[in-house]
């Protein structure tokens, strides 16, 4: 199945049903009190994570989704039926962004997780709600509110522990083939990898982690060159980044400049991603003598002023790959789990437009008055007497 990690959809929550103006009518009761019922709430729209899905391709062909409208109220204090909700299944790791506001509406990280993305409209109030000691025959009602309408951008972010980045043909796909059972395409031309791929790596002590391989970056990727930076989003949830550097590029380019290009593109994309722990992987060391490879690596480290961890590997022959994986597994055990701060929670809170609707309705806003009850006269309503035969 084709891998699709981004789709745009439009969701319409159901409108609320209207309240109704009605009065109690039956034999021998000519002027009963108000009995207009409320409308029903509109249906909501939800996203639910499903571990059996791994692509958003279904939402490329069907972009519009509507929840059911609430039914109107009726006489006899009958409340209208609530509209049916609609639930859209998406892969685990999907997030939803409101295109108009840019806010993150939902982020689904575990199987079965369910979040609302569009709230149904509130029900309208029937005239029974407006009766009082001074208004015994209210002709007021309120209409149901419109349901939320949102245009959402669905983004599928791979859930991986380790993310790989580098220029095309740096050896990222060869590395993931060497350390896992994943088999991404490998060839001697740029952009062999067109979509991200995942591999499960086994390390010592029965430890394991997931590594993600994304298409290569080139200079100007932040401005759309090559495949752009659209796949960098898959690194946002990674805990460690592996920056693969080809110490002997086939095109004769400078490894130092190549490394700086990747760092620059990463920083332009996101400071948060750029600040993640990042290790350098010097690949294709088997193409040079050991002394020459060490000399080349030291030159690169000095030019980058690099003081963090780095490893020398030859992915095609799997030289140094197992030691690297063991070190990665041990290092990730020392990393703290990400905990969302109160500020981040507040920033991610979604404010819906209908939160204060009922308060506004009862205060007199959006009240509709029906004047078609001319046969009713408040002045004449002094109660009525029911005669009961003994």
From Swiss-Prot:
GO MF, one example: GTP binding
CDD domains to which the protein is assigned, alphabetical: Obg
Localization of this protein: Cytoplasm
Domain Obg, first and last residues per copy: 1-159
One Pfam family from the record: MMR_HSR1
InterPro entries linked to this entry: G_OBG (IPR031167), GTP-bd (IPR006073), GTP-bd_Obg/CgtA (IPR014100), GTP1-OBG_CS (IPR006074), GTP1_OBG_dom (IPR006169), GTP1_OBG_dom_sf (IPR036726), OBG_GTPase (IPR045086), P-loop_NTPase (IPR027417)
One GO CC term on file: cytoplasm
Keywords, in A-Z order: Cytoplasm, GTP-binding, Hydrolase, Magnesium, Metal-binding, Nucleotide-binding
Keyword Iron-sulfur: no
Stored Gene3D superfamilies: GTP1/OBG domain, P-loop containing nucleotide triphosphate hydrolases
Sites where the protein binds Mg(2+): 173, 193
Domain OBG-type G: 160-333
EC number: 3.6.5.-
Major site of localization recorded for this protein: cytoplasm
Cofactor dependence: Mg(2+)
The keyword Nucleus is annotated on this UniProt entry: no
Annotated residues for binding of GTP: 166-173, 191-195, 213-216, 283-286, 314-316
Family: Belongs to the TRAFAC class OBG-HflX-like GTPase superfamily. OBG GTPase family.
Function field: An essential GTPase which binds GTP, GDP and possibly (p)ppGpp with moderate affinity, with high nucleotide exchange rates and a fairly low GTP hydrolysis rate. Plays a role in control of the cell cycle, stress response, ribosome biogenesis and in those bacteria that undergo differentiation, in morphogenesis control.
HAMAP family registered for this protein in UniProt: GTPase_Obg
NCBIfam families hit by this protein: Obg_CgtA, PRK12297.1, PRK12299.1
Name of protein: GTPase Obg
Primary gene name: obg
């Amino acid at each position: 199945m084709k891998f699709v990690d981004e789709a745009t959809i439009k969701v319409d929550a159901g409108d609320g049903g209207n309240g109704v103006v009605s009065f109690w009518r039956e034999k021998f009761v000519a002027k009963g009190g108000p009995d207009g019922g409320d409308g029903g709430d509109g249906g909501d729209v939800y996203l639910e994570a499903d571990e059996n899905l791994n692509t958003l391709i279904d939402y490329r062909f069907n972009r519009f989704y509507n929840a059911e409208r609430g039914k109107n109220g009726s006489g006899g204090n009958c409340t209208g039926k609530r509209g049916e909700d609609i639930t859209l299944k998406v892969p685990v790791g999907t997030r939803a962004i409101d295109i108009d506001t840019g806010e993150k509406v939902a982020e689904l990280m575990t199987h079965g997780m369910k979040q609302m993305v569009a709230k149904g409209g509130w029900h309208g109030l029937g005239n029974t709600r407006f009766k009082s000691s001074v208004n015994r025959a209210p002709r007021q009602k309120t209409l149901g509110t419109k349901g939320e309408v949102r245009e959402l951008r669905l983004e599928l972010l791979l859930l991986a522990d380790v993310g790989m980045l580098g220029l095309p043909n740096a050896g990222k796909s060869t590395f993931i083939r060497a350390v896992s059972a994943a088999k991404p395409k490998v060839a001697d031309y740029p952009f062999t990898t067109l979509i991200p791929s995942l591999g499960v790596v086994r390390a010592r002590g029965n430890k394991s982690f997931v590594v993600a391989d994304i298409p290569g970056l080139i200079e100007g990727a932040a401005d759309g060159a090559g495949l752009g930076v659209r796949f960098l989003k898959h690194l946002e949830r990674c805990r460690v980044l592996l920056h693969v550097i080809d110490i002997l590029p086939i095109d004769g380019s400078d490894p130092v400049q190549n490394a700086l290009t990747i760092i620059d593109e990463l920083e332009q994309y996101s400071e948060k991603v750029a600040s993640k722990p990042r290790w350098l992987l010097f690949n294709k060391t088997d193409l040079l003598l050991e002394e020459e490879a060490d000399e080349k690596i030291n030159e690169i480290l000095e030019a980058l002023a690099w003081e963090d961890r780095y490893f020398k590997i030859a992915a095609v022959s799997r030289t140094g790959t197992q030691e690297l994986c063991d070190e990665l597994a041990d290092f990730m055990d020392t990393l703290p789990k990400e905990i969302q701060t109160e500020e981040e929670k507040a920033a991610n809170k979604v404010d819906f437009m209908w939160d204060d609707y009922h308060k506004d309705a009862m205060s007199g806003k959006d009240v509709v008055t029906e004047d078609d009850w001319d046969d009713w006269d408040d002045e004449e309503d002094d109660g009525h007497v029911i005669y009961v035969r003994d």
